[in-house]
Amino acid sequence: MEGDQRSGPPAQSLLPDGHLVLWTLCSVLLPVFITLWCSLQRSRRQLHRRDIFRKSKHCWRDTDLFSHPTYCCVCAQHILQGAFCDCCGLRVDEGCLKKVDKRFPCKEIMLKNDKAADAMPHHWIRGNVPLCSYCVFCRQQCGSQPKLCDYRCIWCQKTVHDECMRGSLRSEKCDFGEFRNLIIPPSYLTSINQMRKDKNTNYEGLASKFGKQWTPLIILANSRSGTNMGEGLLGEFKILLNPVQVFDVTKTPPIKALQLCTLLPYYSVRVLVCGGDGTVGWVLDAIDEMKIKGQEKYIPEVAVLPLGTGNDLSNTLGWGTGYAGEIPVAQVLRNVMEADGIKLDRWKVQVTNKGYYNLRKPKEFTMNNYFSVGPDALMALNFHAHREKAPSLFSSRILNKAVYLFYGTKDCLVQECKDLNKKIELELDGERVELPNLEGIIVLNIGYWGGGCRLWEGMGDETYPLARHDDGLLEIVGVYGSFHCAQIQVKLANPFRIGQAHTVRLTLKCSMMPMQVDGEPWAQGPCTVTITHKTHALMLYFSGEQSDDDISSPSDHEDVKEAE
């Protein structure tokens, strides 16, 4: 009897534990409900903030976390999240957004008519002064107390302690600080507006009071370049300059933005392009359109702040291969002020298809960097095709280089561009050139190619003709394949230097071949490619980051190896 009772399990253990199931469901579903509720509340807050942003005179951007200790300019409380103005730098929490416009005006791009144009006072805002800033009165550090304290002028960026702020400072005329020679003062635009009403377009006399050192700067930034780094740069430049000088080229095309040059003195304007080589080419095309319109006197000089990958043109001009925030924006402006003007050759690439009895219009491109046919164009074409399908996957430099490595390795095995010399005829200045067994031909205008490789120079152990980007000459080289390209990039091999020429003509006799102009690839059938000089572009060269390119005076070229 006792054995039978022990062998049978309890009836209760056969049933599922209802409490355990209930607690399991709660532990799984409760975080889901909390996440959904928080997401809904956040969406509602964002809609509410956007409505306020749209009606406000400030240029607000919201953030979930400020990068350094921040205090609300309205209630003076410490805040972790909220909104900040891209133009004047005000920082507020969500609850104080509606009160800001009444108490704190934003930067005025133009003065009101009743203000004296020659006596613009400082525009002070309190709190959140930059780190390592010093009082203009006592020369001691500002912003060192853990509270909303001290003042900053949103035009000249000077800072002053609360206790040092006096009536004389409040009414003192603002001199626009360190970057006065780059800023377009609101008083100037007010005077221009009045002159245009009077149908007077002689702006030279108006600009003379700012001196010969006044070289106003226009910022043209691509907000989509460099994993959207351009968007943050727009705000930083608006704080240091007049917001009217800063443009997002994805919203305002360069040809429209550059019309601001026509309101400024002749031959005085500088432009800083924040983006990749493609954005620079876009801006240079817009400048060419200004020449067609007869606006040669207003043509600006162009500097580059490189974003993204590649950037061979900016590297050639001394601006580096890519900006990742390693130096402050203020230092970028100092570099622009120190830069020297040079010229850059621009070339017309005309592609005429065969077999259409000249009925199809030739395709035309403008080349700043290089043209190529062969393995490097094939890698660019494959990369471009995959990036168009999934752009979000190609935002990392390391990943992009890995993809290029994959396609380069694949081409080493497949050799899709072999026997190029049998498919192409090459003419330099009208003379046909016999080619060895090559897989690619590259036509260079600048010193750098392929993301930082000095292709014409190679390993540097051979004599080679002088190469410049302002002499009206192109350098033409050949490569034996993808593996040869890789060897050249790590300085283990020299390219096959074909020669230099003023005019290059390539005839593709048969089959499809990959081609590219300045990184824009396509697949091309039988055709004739003619490259001729188009124009010069006025660029700015920064000597602080030496690129070893031959762009200085002739005396500096004596040490360069020349062909015998």
Curated annotation (Swiss-Prot):
Bilayer disposition of the protein: Single-pass membrane protein
Keyword NAD set for record: no
Superkingdom: Eukaryota
Reaction equations catalysed: a 1,2-diacyl-sn-glycerol + ATP = a 1,2-diacyl-sn-glycero-3-phosphate + ADP + H(+); 1-hexadecanoyl-2-(5Z,8Z,11Z,14Z-eicosatetraenoyl)-sn-glycerol + ATP = 1-hexadecanoyl-2-(5Z,8Z,11Z,14Z-eicosatetraenoyl)-sn-glycero-3-phosphate + ADP + H(+); 1-octadecanoyl-2-(5Z,8Z,11Z,14Z-eicosatetraenoyl)-sn-glycerol + ATP = 1-octadecanoyl-2-(5Z,8Z,11Z,14Z-eicosatetraenoyl)-sn-glycero-3-phosphate + ADP + H(+); 1-eicosanoyl-2-(5Z,8Z,11Z,14Z)-eicosatetraenoyl-sn-glycerol + ATP = 1-eicosanoyl-2-(5Z,8Z,11Z,14Z)-eicosatetraenoyl-sn-glycero-3-phosphate + ADP + H(+)
Phenotype of null mutants: Homozygous knockout mice are normal, reproduce and behave normally. No gross or histological abnormalities in major organs, including the brain are observed. The phosphatidylinositol 4,5- bisphosphate-signaling pathway in cerebral cortex and long-term potentiation are affected.
Transmembrane stretches, start-end: 20-40
Gene3D superfamilies, sorted: 2.60.200.40, 3.30.60.20, Probable inorganic polyphosphate/atp-NAD kinase, domain 1
Gene Ontology MF annotations: ATP binding; ATP-dependent diacylglycerol kinase activity; zinc ion binding
Zinc finger (Phorbol-ester/DAG-type): 57-106, 121-174
Matches recorded under Pfam families: C1_1 (PF00130), DAGK_acc (PF00609), DAGK_cat (PF00781)
Tissue: Highly expressed in brain and heart. In brain, highly expressed in Purkinje cells of the cerebellum, pyramidal cells of the hippocampus, mitral cells of the olfactory bulb, and neurons of the substantia nigra. Lower expression in neurons of the thalamus, superior olive, and lateral reticular nucleus is also detected. Expressed in platelets.
UniProt similarity note: Belongs to the eukaryotic diacylglycerol kinase family.
Name of the protein in question: Diacylglycerol kinase epsilon
Organism whose genome encodes this protein: Mus musculus (Mouse)
